[in-house]
Regions:
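Active-site helix of classical SDR
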Residues: 129, 165, 173
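Residue(s) in the substrate-gating loop at a strand-loop-helix junction
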Residues: 149
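C-terminal substrate-recognition "lid" of short-chain dehydrogenase/reductases
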Residues: 126, 141, 233-260
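Short, small/polar-rich loop/turn modules that mediate ligand/substrate recognition or access, typified
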Residues: 181, 186, 253-255
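Substrate-binding pocket helix/loop in short-chain dehydrogenase/reductase
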Residues: 105-106, 113-115, 144, 210, ...
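Alpha-helical segment proximal to the catalytic Tyr-Lys
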Residues: 134, 178-179
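Active-site Tyr-X3-Lys motif and surrounding loop/helix of classical short-chain dehydrogenase/reductase
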Residues: 79-86, 104-108, 112-119
Length: 266
């Protein structure tokens, strides 16, 4: 039996790209990859927050590059990947994390709301994968992790459009995994649960919007953890980063949609 060692989860000499890495889950994943030894390109719609993450990665002794990108725009995505290839000479791990959310009932949902969520969350994953694949296939090694959600496994009220985009990511990732399985690539979807980032926290987050009468946002946050999660506590960005590091090192895990959700989707 092979004994697990820290070397099994080393990404030394690997180059990673994380979109939506300026804050929240994307930032946590980028830092986890850097701590595992990877050099990390950090992309975000806001170049300033991307640079803040890149600076944190450099402080860990790894190389980093901050990039601005609109993942719903093909030219912007292709330019991002070309810049990574120019700066680092390769691309080994791609985490297509950039995403948006809005909270609307279907009866109130505008076509603009639908298009915005689908264009970033689903079209963006497609465009990123399409641009990343040639580099990985040329070197016959690559790991792609696309961000879905528990909302890609379970329908949630007021989030039908968001659920549609995240269900799409799972189906796309599963199909792509089969297409590239003989090329030395793996493709998986990560499905975060309830994480204390901007999607959930704050007056405009889900815990703010789903408050009961007389309840504060903080009280709503605690109630949702207690009522929705069998474990009773929220997940962290570090939880997501740990799984991505594992997937980046695992040669035979592919086509999976893995929930890190404290049992929410059971």
């Amino acid at each position: 039996m092979h004994a697990t060692s820290s070397d099994d989860f080393s990404l030394s000499s690997r180059v990673a790209l994380v979109t939506g890495a300026g804050r929240g889950i994307g930032r946590g994943i980028a830092l986890a990859l850097a701590r595992a030894g990877a050099d990390v390109a950090v992309a975000d719609l806001d170049p300033q927050v991307a640079e803040e993450t890149a600076a944190a990665i450099r402080s860990l002794g790894r190389r980093s590059l901050a990039l601005g990108v609109d993942v719903s725009d093909g030219d912007s995505v292709r330019a991002m990947v070309e810049r990574v290839a120019t700066e680092f000479g390769r691309l080994d791990v791609a985490v297509n994390n950039a995403g948006v959310i809005s909270i609307r009932k279907v009866a109130e949902l505008s076509l603009a709301d639908w298009d915005r969520v689908m264009n970033v969350n689903a079209r963006g994953v497609f465009l990123c994968c399409q641009a990343e694949l040639p580099l990985m296939q040329a070197q016959r090694w690559g790991r792609i992790v696309n961000l879905s959600s528990i909302a890609g496994k379970v329908g949630l009220p007021d989030l039908a459009h968001y659920c549609a985009s995240k269900f799409a990511v799972i189906g796309f990732s599963n199909a792509l995994a089969k297409e590239v399985a003989r090329d030395g690539l793996t493709v998986n979807a990560l499905c975060p649960g309830i994480v204390g980032t901007g999607m959930w926290r704050g007056e405009d987050g889900l815990s703010g919007r789903w408050r009961q009468a007389g309840e504060s946002e903080a009280q709503s946050w605690e109630r949702h953890q207690a009522s929705l999660l069998p474990q009773g506590e929220a997940q962290t960005v570090e939880d997501m980063g740990q799984l991505v590091v594992y997937l980046a090192c695992a040669p035979h895990v592919t086509g999976q949609a893995i929930a890190v959700d404290g049992g929410f989707s059971l």
